[in-house]
Design a protein with these regions (language model features):
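Short beta-strand elements that form the blades of beta-propeller/WD-repeat-like
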Residues: 37-49, 87-98, 134-150, 204-213, ...
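Intrinsically disordered, low-complexity segments enriched in Gly and acidic/Ser/Thr residues
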Residues: 338-430
């Protein structure tokens, strides 16, 4: 079976705008699978940096393993995206603009082998994570509730979910009610609010990392500061400050008071109601992090077991009380279970004290890891190395055969015929897809996109009738 994975971050409020363009009829073919005898093609989202402007081009190709492509006088021009999401033979461009609505739309592969924009366009505000469930792409974010406000005027934090039905090209959102307010306050029983990182479907269940964010104004003020731990009072901000993703309000306690815990929310479906919460104290928070982005690190292996990875990003916190003492590692929830078993592996100790930025399934019980180039305790760490983690043997092996001048690694991976593929951007050359054999951790050079400066996403699509 061949899979496409797209991961990352964000939360969305979407308002569809019908644009007079191509038809949105249509049932998907074998979504997400690459049938060698199909009319499908590989699709590459590329960035082209000109002397005066930047352009974005969707290219199609026949192979990941060899050859060259060029965006010059070729492909479909588009507005670019923060994250390209391939799901069931549809390609969605999720665009995130801080503080303003971003525009996204979806694309299909036509019978003529050319990419086509579909007719509906969406406005997306802030989103912090996303995933997929059945026919829907899910975007999630935690934000202020308009309905639950305390006597100080502080708003409780709630979950906002948008459902993008890729087949019917519709967008719906969850609606808070008195019965179901979708509150994220005191989500774990310690007073802190959480955000969700990733959404991994296994069977009918949905697995999300529950990421404790600290105490909101609402949580910190609750019952005269009931949830502020003794000795942690200095962490409550006395005035507003910061900027961007690091901004905060007076009265907030930013960052968890419980950094040595890992929580997973397991939902029976995608309504995001009544989750089963499972905890382990062997690893820290189950999410990668880069600025305001939260990277999914909970993934299902081919046999349905759920592997929960933690990069221990809380080691970067400034206050010692908020630093985790736990190494980057992985635990497991067996297929069909709602509890962690005794599986555990310390990944950091196998990497000379280094952690990882993000990870994806690579087929079987293998996982591809984007490794940091130095420990999180040092400044300037960057995710420019790759490694394969074998969950069966609990062995981490760095990938060989990669170029030495890597500047960045792709946001998307693709598995096919026992190999995993990832875009690699280099300082002296064009972006290239590399093929990695998980069993040997050996990489080999694949298709090159000449004239581009970046491959921001790639996957496989079959024509939609």
């Amino acid at each position: 079976m061949n899979k496409k994975f797209v991961f990352g971050v964000f939360g969305a409020l979407m308002m569809p705008m019908v644009m007079g363009s191509c038809s949105s009829s249509d049932e998907p073919q074998k979504g997400g699978e690459d049938d060698n005898e199909s009319k499908g093609k590989f699709v590459f989202a590329t960035t082209v940096q000109g002397s005066n402007a930047t352009s974005y081009v969707l290219l199609t190709g026949e192979s990941l393993d060899e050859g060259t492509l060029s965006p010059v006088n070729n492909g479909l021009l588009n507005d670019g995206a923060t994250q390209w999401v391939f799901h069931k033979n549809y390609l969605y461009a999720l665009t995130y603009n801080q503080g303003n609505a971003g525009t996204t739309r979806s694309y299909i592969l036509g019978d003529d082998g050319e990419m086509k924009a579909r007719g509906t366009e969406y406005r997306i505000s802030r989103f912090s994570s996303y995933g997929a469930y059945d026919n829907d792409i899910l975007t999630m974010a935690t934000g202020e509730s308009n309905d639950v406000v305390d006597g100080n005027g502080y708003h409780a934090m709630m979950l906002n979910v948008t459902y993008l039905d890729v087949v019917n090209e519709t967008s719906t959102t969850n609606h808070a009610t008195a019965e179901h307010p979708y509150l994220m306050e005191n989500f774990l029983g310690n007073g802190e609010y959480v955000t969700l990182s990733g959404a991994e479907q296994s069977g009918s269940h949905l697995y999300c990392g529950a990421i404790p964010m600290g105490l909101s104004q609402y949580g910190a003020a609750y019952d005269n500061g009931k949830w502020i731990r003794e000795g942690y009072e200095h962490l409550v901000h006395s005035e507003a400050g910061g900027s961007g993703a690091g901004s905060y309000k007076a009265g907030e306690l930013v960052g968890t008071q419980y950094p040595d815990e890992c929580w997973v929310a397991i939902y029976d479906n995608d309504d995001f109601l009544n989750p089963t919460l499972v905890k382990t104290d062997r690893i820290s928070t189950p999410s990668g992090r880069f600025r305001s982005q939260y990277y999914q690190t909970i993934w299902a292996a081919d046999n349905g077991d759920i592997y929960v990875f933690s990069p221990s990003y809380a080691k970067t916190m400034t206050d010692p009380l908020q630093k985790t003492k736990l190494n980057a590692g992985v635990c497991r929830i067996p297929a069909g279970s709602k509890q962690f078993d005794d599986y555990y592996c310390d990944i950091e100790s196998q990497a000379d004290g280094k952690s990882f930025m993000r990870c994806w399934p690579a087929g079987g019980n293998y996982f591809l890891m984007v490794m940091y180039d130095r420990p999180l305790s040092e400044s300037g760490f960057a995710g420019t190395d790759l490694a394969i983690f074998d969950a069966t043997s609990k062995k981490l092996t760095y990938v060989s055969g990669l170029p030495s001048d890597i500047t960045s690694l792709g946001k998307t991976v693709f598995t096919r015929n026992g190999n995993v593929y990832i875009p690699v951007n280099v300082e002296n050359g064009y972006p290239t897809i590399y093929k990695i054999n998980p069993a040997t951790a050996q990489a080999s050079k694949g298709v090159v996109v000449e004239g581009a400066s970046d491959i921001t996403g790639f996957g496989f699509l079959e024509p939609v009738k």
